[in-house]
């Protein structure tokens, strides 16, 4: 994880120098930690914040981590030897409550299943969610909660709620035991797509950084056909693994341009 953290620290430092040169912040805050620096910058100017997700920053270390050999060993035990990385991939900088650009709670996800946010084409297929904190995830800074007992019910009804996002309808969530999952930096949470989960508000004064990724058997639909997937591991066809960073960058650039209605 450290190369990913270093990459993000370098980007934030570069952007901080830009903002300072434009008189948009009062200082660089270079003495502050990875968990703290973005908070201090965003208190003065938050234009960096929307740039940080993996498909926008598109860092080389992030690309390499998607197919990290140690991670692939874990994923292959569940998915099998032919693995594709879904385009549902995020690096999340969860700011303290109320500090995100629109004034809402940044990355406070409501109760949902990952199966509820993909197109129906993916419904018959297994998709594995991998969630990793880049810093310690606690109840104070907004760790995850899950309701494991409901996964046996399959896909529950979801709806889009203004200011909240896609969430499970209330009547589908009976009184069940909720597990709160504080985690250490570098630990891994594995979820199948039917486990209801949410993140809680960040009530600390630091950023809760995390990565969440989706993996599935190569050849199965991702439920996000408008964004790029790619092969990260293959025993039968090793040459099919995407190792070229520039190609991955271009795949995302073109997909994002098309989604805005702009032809590259």
Q: Which residues are covered by each model-predicted region?
A:
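Short, surface-exposed loop/helix-turn segments at secondary-structure junctions
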Residues: 34-36, 107-113, 163-175, 226-232
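Double-stranded beta-helix
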Residues: 137-196
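A short secondary-structure junction signal
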Residues: 97-106, 111, 121-122, 140-146, ...
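Short, solvent-exposed loop/turn segments at secondary-structure junctions
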Residues: 1, 91-93, 116, 137-139, ...
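Short, conserved beta-strand element in jelly-roll/cupin
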Residues: 112, 116-139, 182-185, 190, ...
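Short edge-strand/loop segments of extracellular domains
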Residues: 96, 147-154, 208, 214-219
């Amino acid at each position: 994880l450290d190369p990913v953290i270093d990459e993000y620290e370098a980007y934030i430092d570069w952007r901080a120098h830009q903002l300072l040169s434009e008189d948009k912040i009062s200082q660089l805050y270079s003495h502050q930690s990875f968990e703290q620096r973005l908070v201090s910058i965003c208190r003065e100017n938050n234009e960096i914040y929307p740039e940080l997700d993996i498909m926008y920053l598109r860092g080389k270390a992030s690309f390499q981590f998607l197919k990290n050999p140690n991670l692939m060993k874990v994923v292959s035990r569940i998915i099998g030897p032919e693995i594709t990385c879904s385009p549902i991939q995020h690096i999340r900088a969860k700011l303290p409550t109320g500090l995100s650009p629109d004034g809402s709670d940044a990355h406070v996800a409501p109760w949902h299943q990952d199966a509820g946010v993909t197109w129906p084409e993916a419904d018959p297929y297994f998709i594995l969610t991998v969630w990793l904190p880049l810093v310690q995830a606690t109840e104070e800074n907004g760790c995850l909660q899950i309701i494991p007992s409901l996964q046996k019910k399959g896909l529950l009804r979801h709806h889009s709620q203004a200011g909240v996002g896609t969430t499970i309808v209330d009547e589908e969530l009976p009184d069940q035991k909720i597990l709160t999952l504080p985690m250490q930096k570098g630990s891994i949470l594995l979820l199948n797509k039917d486990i209801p989960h949410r993140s809680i508000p960040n009530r600390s004064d630091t950023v809760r950084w995390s990565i969440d990724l989706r993996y599935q058997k190569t050849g199965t639909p991702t439920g996000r056909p408008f964004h790029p997937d790619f092969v990260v591991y293959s025993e039968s066809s090793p040459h099919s693994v995407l190792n070229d960073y520039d190609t991955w960058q271009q795949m995302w650039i073109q997909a994002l341009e098309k989604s805005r209605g702009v032809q590259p």
